[in-house]
């Protein structure tokens, strides 16, 4: 009964949040005009900072609070392959708030088609079109280029939303872990603990204010791993993240 009474207010809140999102997108596009002539690294850092201000301002106006929890030591002056769980569109804003280092996320090509936002999105992420082998290979080269320039990358190893409340994670793809081994870059697992509560995967009109916790799990160093150990590394990180999510959220026993 109470949910029915509050539902109209939630819809109004969601419309308000979408308006704030649209305004910030327009402002960010204008800000980007001034940094486009910069070289690769400084352009990436500039776009990261714009994205960070975008995210922090969005949170301020829609009543959300970013909180980071560290279960291990993280070296901010070193490039990492960040990997995180993915079951909400609200997993995206925390990525650029992961302080204090520039990050290039791997994102779906389809999202670049969103009116207005798509223009901003193309410069923030490294896009992947999984339906096109050539473009997929180019995305891999772009990820490697970022790491060579000491820019961290962020990959959702599940590949898409985990659209279930029954278990924390889907199976992982190999890409992030293969890349970390090949480039000898440490893996930083992070947990988006509350994103699904802020916006459920069932629809955008489930948006609600509140806390958004991001948990840094201990960094996984890959110095002693070869490509022959790819499956071992992938399962190790999957187990770490599964255990971590079960500590912070309630799931049925596995």
Predicted regions: what is each one?
Residues 1-65:
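N-terminal membrane-anchoring alpha-helices
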Residues 4-8, 138-254:
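Non-catalytic C-terminal accessory region of glycerolipid acyltransferases
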Residues 25, 29-49, 61, 75-133:
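Catalytic core of membrane glycerolipid acyltransferases/transacylases, capturing the structured
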Residues 61-69, 136-137, 196-199:
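Short gly/ser/thr-rich secondary-structure transition/capping motifs
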Residues 68, 82, 105, 214-216:
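Generic preference for hydrophobic
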Residues 68, 126-129, 222:
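Short acidic-hydrophobic, aromatic-tinged amphipathic segments that line or gate anion-handling sites
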Residues 71-76, 206-207:
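A short beta-turn/loop motif at secondary-structure boundaries
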């Amino acid at each position: 009964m109470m949910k029915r009474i509050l539902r109209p207010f939630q819809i109004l809140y969601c419309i308000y949040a979408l308006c704030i999102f649209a305004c910030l997108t327009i402002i960010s596009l204008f800000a980007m005009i001034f940094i486009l002539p910069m070289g690769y690294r400084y352009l990436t850092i500039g776009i990261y900072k714009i994205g960070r201000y975008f995210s922090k301002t969005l949170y301020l106006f829609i009543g959300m609070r970013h909180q980071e929890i560290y279960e291990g030591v993280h070296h901010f002056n070193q490039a990492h392959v960040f990997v995180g769980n993915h079951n909400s569109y609200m997993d995206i804003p925390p990525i650029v708030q992961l302080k204090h280092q520039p990050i290039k996320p791997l994102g779906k090509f389809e999202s670049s088609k969103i009116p207005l936002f798509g223009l901003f999105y193309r410069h923030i992420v490294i896009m992947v079109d999984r339906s096109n082998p050539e473009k997929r290979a180019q995305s891999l080269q772009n990820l490697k280029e970022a790491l060579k320039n000491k820019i961290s990358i962020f990959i959702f190893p599940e590949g898409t939303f985990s659209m279930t409340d029954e278990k924390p994670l889907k199976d992982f793809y190999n890409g992030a872990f293969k890349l970390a081994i090949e480039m000898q870059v440490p893996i930083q697992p992070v947990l988006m603990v509350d994103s699904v509560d802020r916006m459920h995967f069932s629809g955008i009109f489930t948006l609600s204010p509140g806390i958004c916790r991001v948990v840094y799990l201990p960094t996984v160093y890959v110095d002693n791993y070869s490509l022959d150990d790819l499956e071992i590394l992938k399962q190790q990180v999957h187990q770490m993240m599964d255990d971590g999510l079960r500590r912070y959220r309630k799931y049925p026993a596995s």
